[in-house]
Each structure stands twice: as structure tokens, then as C-alpha cells.
């Protein structure tokens, strides 16, 4: 099926800014320096309701409301993938790699996790539009019922002038608007609910910038500081919005990841900042210019994987070293690889393995504790990073113990067993894949792999030119990925 996405700029949809009702929750207090307004929610028509995380406890579980009436019950979870291409988004079955649906959507679009196991957030020219991947589970007593439906781009859009990073952590989803500095944090389970924003935590940074925010389980918030011209550091706010700690020794802030124990790592042009235990620690890079702008974290590991660039004058560096930041002692080590990589090359395995997709076509598996490359799995032909960060290049996405790798040159996608060291399934595509993301079909939960799924190069749309944080882990700036 081929759906046409509603126009997020439709004059009939007049987004209204709302703030969280007073007293609804203490954690929704705004930043001390600026009272923020809730991110506008655009409802073009009858909005699709999001999948609830709780099912009815009657004789039979009721499927969650869907944007389509074509709902089928399945025997098990049906994880799905989404890939962007020039002209739309294709949704695939993550097990068979077959195309489930093709959704038309013009423009350069980015895929972000929503955090509820069913939806994705598509960064468009109008904001963050909710994509229903059409797979979910409904708890029912001591078991669950599983459902599938046709994927659809819903009419729910969180309006943003320049949609930037999306960070999912501990059942909460944080959206950052680079054009205004507005931050909206809401329960992941309500992202697709047009009323979910009513209880959202909202705030605005003192100045608009390509930024990021991470909310932790106690309601504290790590938020970047900067302007359109320069990003300098981060602040740690408590649940009431009061400053607990701050550090302005992080030039070019970009990218974030959460490690075991809720330690947050923020990338800088000369190392990283580690936010843990209510304190912010600077970890210097071994080079005067050692940019880490894309990271991938895992709740299974205290070590965060990051990129590493050391040539401030390079237009396109093509790095061959990655960084491993140990949040236990705030230390940093570099690992040499046999090939370069890009901002879409970083991922984490279920056991915390550090995964890097190289331009040699292999998926390199690194032990984060020893820094040793334990295996390299050939996946695609050798390739070269394109000059423009928006151009398609092989991308890595890890879900449910499987590493998925796209091959734009071959118009294909591969599922890789990174533990067994083999490609177990491949499929041809009828489009040139660009971005890659997915959903498990499981309801929103706390914990899990953390990465800024909005890796970019630092430079554009959330990118800082030439440094790109792949929202990769997160370089949401042009290619400084």
C-alpha cells in the first residue's frame, strides 16, 4: 500500500501552544532561566491514537486503537524496520525483510525512536511526525496478545521550526527544537496520543541552538547550553528545574548516550563530559582537537562507544579510530580499526558489544572492556563515505540481537548475527535506502539501549557543519559524524 502523508503545514491545522497544567507533576517545572511553552501539537484531522501499554483485563485483550481499521492478531511479536528513501519511507518486516508498506513523504526525512515499541518520529519540515509502524502487544493477565496493522503516517505532528535530537530513556521521550530551543519531554507510551502532550514537561533554553536534552529516572535533566554560533557545555537540573551542576568546558557540544547506572556522556570537540552522581566531569581527548560527536550507549555497559576525529581542518576526515569512554572512572581510550566509518556506523549489541560498520564493508565487533576487536563480519562491498552527509551510505541499526545493515549501492538490506559472525538473511530493495530505524512491537519500558538515534554530521539539521553528530549516537549536525 502506498499512502500519502498529510501536509504538516496545512492551514487547517493551526498548532496551538499549550503548557502543562499547574501542579500536574513536580517534574514538569521549567528551566530556571526561561519558562518554556509546550511543543505545539498539530492535529490535521482525526488523530491516530497511540498504543497503550496496558491491555484490558476482560475475557479478551482489546487491540490498541490504530490509524487503520485493518488490524490482525498475530501469534507472536512482529518487529518491523523503517527505511527512508528519496520520496518516502518503507516499512519492512524485521524477520523476513519483506516490504510491508511504502509511505510517500517528500523531502529529506529523518527517523527517530518514539520509545513505545510501535511508533517512530519522522523529522520533517513541519516537525516530528508520528509514524505508526503497525505492530504492538497488549498485556492480558499472565500473557499478551499481539497485533499488526498497515503502517501509516499519522496526523499527529509535534511542530518544530528545526526538529533536532530525540532521546528516549527510561520510558520518557525528549524532543529538542533547534530553531527555538524548546524542549518537550513526555511519556513514551503517549507519544502517539494527541492528548499525551497535556502532561508533558516543557522548557526552553536561554538561546536556540543545535542541542539535546536527556531526562533521567529521578526527573533530573541534562540539557545543552549554547547559541546558534557556539555550543559550550551542559547543565544538570533537578526535577524542580533548579541547577545542580554546570560545565562550560565542552566546545561544540554534540551527541549524547546513556550508559549503565544512568551515566550520561556528552560529546565535545576536545573530549567528552560525563554526567554521573550529580556531578559533571570533563574527560580530555589525547589530542588538542579530538572531536567526539556521535555516541552509542547501552544499559548493559558502563562504557560508551563514540566516534573520534582529530583533524580540525579536514572537510571530510574519514576517521579510523573510535573512542571508548568508561563512565566508572571517567577515562577514555582509542581503538584503531582497519577501515574508516561514518556517523551511521555505530551501534551496541544486547550484551553491550560495541559495533562499528566500516567502509571495508565489515561489521567490527569490539569488546568494550578490553578495547579489542573480537571479530569482523563481512556484510557489504567496500564503500566510500560521500561528501555530503545527507547522501545515502550504509547504515547500521541494532534491534533484538540482530544488526541490520543497508546497502545503498546494491539496493539491499542485510540481517547480521554479530555473535555468530554471519549474515543470516538478505533482501533486495526497490529503493535506495538512506536512514534506518525500527520498532520491536513491545510496549514502552524502562531501561535498554541508549543512543542518540538522531545521528548526524554536525552541521545540518541538527548538524553542525562539518561536524556531524550522528544522532548517530548522535551527530545531528551535518557530517561531523
Model-derived features with residue positions:
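Long, acidic/polar, low-complexity amphipathic helices and coiled-coil-like
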Residues: 145-267
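C-terminal motif of bacterial Sec signal peptides marking the signal peptidase cleavage site
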Residues: 43-46
